[in-house]
């Protein structure tokens, strides 16, 4: 299930690269969240989950829609007009680093330990390695990769803010936030992209948008929450290691993308930082307990 989720989320960068041929960023993101919204609400109704009427819930999911959908989706999609999908996926893997820093500042119960601090520093060291070289075959500056890091920061804010929905059915929270982000994106897409002037998208673009929305968003959320319930949040950190690998395989295999050696080194350093944060590979195995024979 972890590998499946990593392929779905890694595939979002791949689908973006294809769809950007015909669609501008805001319209593409609007298609993603609006189609995903319809799928998620269908699941909510299928499971007969009660829809809250409390205004605080809807205000909360509106904030989540901005932090977890609107801001990061738009930033990442725009960045992919400048950098490869593989590099965007690598930089997006810094999300847990930002989540830890934000939780340390914003909460009293999730302070950084020495091990996690070292892991965060190592992870950002990997970012420095990546930023130390051009981000593609031509000079595109730092704006596009910085946009991905800002998206990761926004995801981190959403991760901390979203803990207030611990008692809410996760699929309901997901449907609420994609609904809110759809409503926020609609006027932006109309005013900026003027989609009625866009050419008719090709079949490959339509399929990419459907894959982006239904697989990499709606199905990915459903699978994410299933793993969270079955395996716990700590095991989901493994997905962060696997997403860039999936994106690199898809980008290199189907889009002809090539990463510089420094990008691969940077990814490895970020991965090392995440492993240090996770801590399980560094912990000493517990000695086997003697088995007391039963009568």
Name every feature range the model reports, one short phrase each.
Residues 19, 28, 32, 79, ...:
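Hydrophobic/aromatic residues within transmembrane alpha-helices
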Residues 29-31, 69, 88-94, 160-183, ...:
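Helix-helix packing/entry segments at the starts of transmembrane helices
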Residues 8, 12-13, 41-92, 127-129, ...:
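Specific transmembrane alpha-helical segments of multi-pass solute transporters/efflux pumps
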Residues 40, 62, 102, 115-134, ...:
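Hydrophobic transmembrane alpha-helices of multi-pass small-molecule transport proteins
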Residues 7-37, 78, 84-86, 157-181:
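Juxtamembrane helix-loop-helix junctions in multi-pass membrane proteins
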Residues 40, 99-101, 105, 137-195, ...:
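Transmembrane alpha-helical segments that form core, pore/gating elements
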Residues 39-51, 96-118, 245-265:
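C-terminal transmembrane-helix exit sites in multi-pass transporters
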Residues 21-30, 53-59, 117, 132-154, ...:
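Juxtamembrane helix-entry segments on the extracytoplasmic side of multipass membrane proteins
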């Amino acid at each position: 299930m972890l590998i499946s989720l990593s392929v779905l989320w890694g595939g979002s960068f791949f689908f973006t690269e294809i769809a950007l041929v015909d669609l501008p960023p805001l319209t593409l993101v609007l298609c993603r969240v609006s189609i995903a919204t319809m799928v998620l609400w269908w699941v909510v109704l299928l499971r007969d989950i009660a829809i809250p009427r409390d205004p605080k819930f809807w205000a909360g999911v509106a904030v989540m829609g901005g932090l977890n959908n609107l801001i990061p989706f738009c930033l990442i999609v725009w960045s992919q007009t400048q950098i490869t999908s593989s590099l965007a996926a690598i930089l997006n893997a810094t999300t847990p680093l930002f989540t830890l820093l934000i939780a340390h500042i914003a909460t009293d119960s999730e302070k950084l330990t020495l091990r996690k601090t070292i892991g965060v520093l190592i992870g950002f060291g990997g970012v420095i390695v990546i930023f130390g070289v051009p981000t593609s075959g031509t000079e595109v500056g730092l704006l596009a990769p910085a946009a991905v890091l800002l998206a990761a920061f926004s995801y981190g804010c959403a991760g901390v803010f979203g803990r207030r929905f611990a008692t809410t059915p996760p699929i309901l929270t997901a449907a609420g936030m994609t609904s809110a982000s759809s409503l926020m994106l609609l006027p932006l897409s109309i005013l900026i992209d003027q989609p009625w002037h866009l050419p008719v998208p090709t079949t490959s673009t339509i399929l990419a948008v459907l894959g982006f929305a239904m697989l990499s968003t709606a199905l990915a959320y459903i699978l994410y929450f299933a793993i969270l319930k079955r395996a716990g949040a700590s095991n989901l950190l493994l997905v962060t290691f696997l997403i860039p690998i999936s994106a690199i395989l898809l980008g290199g295999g189907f889009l002809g993308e090539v990463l510089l050696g420094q990008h691969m080194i940077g990814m490895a350093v970020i991965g090392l930082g995440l492993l240090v944060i996770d801590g399980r590979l560094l912990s000493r195995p517990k000695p086997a307990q003697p088995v007391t024979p039963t009568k």
